[in-house]
From Swiss-Prot:
Part of the 30S ribosomal subunit. Interacts with proteins S7 and S18. Binds to IF-3. Disulfide bonds: none annotated. GO terms for biological process: translation. InterPro entries: Ribosomal_uS11 (IPR001971), Ribosomal_uS11_bac-type (IPR019981), Ribosomal_uS11_CS (IPR018102), Ribosomal_uS11_sf (IPR036967). The keyword RNA-binding applies. This is Small ribosomal subunit protein uS11. Belongs to the universal ribosomal protein uS11 family. The keyword Chaperone does not apply. Pfam families: Ribosomal_S11 (PF00411). One of its GO terms (molecular function) is structural constituent of ribosome. GO terms for cellular component: ribonucleoprotein complex; ribosome.
Amino acid sequence: MAAPKSAARKPRKKEKKNIAVGQAHIKSTFNNTIVSITDTTGAVLSWASSGGVGFKGSRKSTPYAAQLAAESAARQAQEHGMKKVDVFVKGPGSGRETAIRSLQAAGLEVGSINDVTPQAHNGCRPPKRRRV
């Protein structure tokens, strides 16, 4: 006979960190946009993606979806005391500029904007061209 289950674990409340300065990493691909807000060492405080905000399919790649994802991540980071961020943008997607603007609109002060998109030195073969 199976032993009776012990009491369910209480969900632990997220501890509130007091971090005023951090980094915002925006990865914008052709299919999705992911916004991660970290402290200066790179430990993630909050993140959000276009898909996680509620968009599916081709709507994930829109600038509006990137805007909502950035607002959501900024709101969570401000709960930890975040006030100023340096932005690192990666990828060719359409949500790059919109995500940066919505971070500012959410109340985070943007210190610097860096493009860290990786450039291939003749590495992998790129996908074939679309014929529409």
